[in-house]
Amino acid sequence: LGVFVDEALDFLDSHGLPLEAVAVSCGPGSYTGLRIGVSMAKGICYGRGVKLIAVPTLELMAVPVLLGEHPEEEDALIVPMLDARRMEVYAEVLDRALKVVRPIQADIVDADTYKEYLDQHHVYFFGNGAAKCMETINHPNAHLVEGIEPLAKNMAPLAEKRFVEGKFEDVAYFVPFYLKDFVAKMPKKLL
């Protein structure tokens, strides 16, 4: 990651292009991945004196769904999901305008987890936590959208919107949104 970032910054410098802000996925997600990404972004912002923009991981996952064929229904809801092991997912319920219907939380998925939404709307589930939940959810209004992962390229429109709106983070005090506390475990194999 460091080499790629260095090359990108060299490209900007060699072409006289300004850097005004750095956007980073702020979570939820992998503890290590979030720490590395946020630390790199904060270092660039501090070193270059530019703004920091944080984009929630689940929101950036919604971009390709909204740009694709789904959802067709005007009142449909979308639910990006990240696998949190076993039958647990990190999920958020959004409308088609990316307005939060239900904030991000850790859900232990059973047949009733999203029933209140499914009884009134078509609901599109996607992300690496969605497939394992579909059999359990089993509702005629539940739809699985496959192949959606959190990709940096989907961050651009959301980061630009935050830039225009002046929604920046404090570089010194910003921390990723882990959702759950980190629990250290002893390795199964000791060296």
Question: Which sequence ranges carry the predicted segments?
Answer:
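Surface "functional belts" at beta-alpha junctions
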Residues: 51-150, 178, 183-184, 188
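N-terminal beta-alpha supersecondary unit
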Residues: 1-28
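DPxDG-like acidic metal-binding loop motif
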Residues: 23-57
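Stable alpha-helical structural segments in soluble proteins, enriched in small hydrophobic residues
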Residues: 8-12, 47, 65, 152-163
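Short helix-terminating capping/connector loops at secondary-structure junctions
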Residues: 14-18, 72-74, 169
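Acyltransferase
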Residues: 145-191
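A general structural signal for well-ordered alpha-helical segments in protein cores
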Residues: 1-5, 41, 152-156
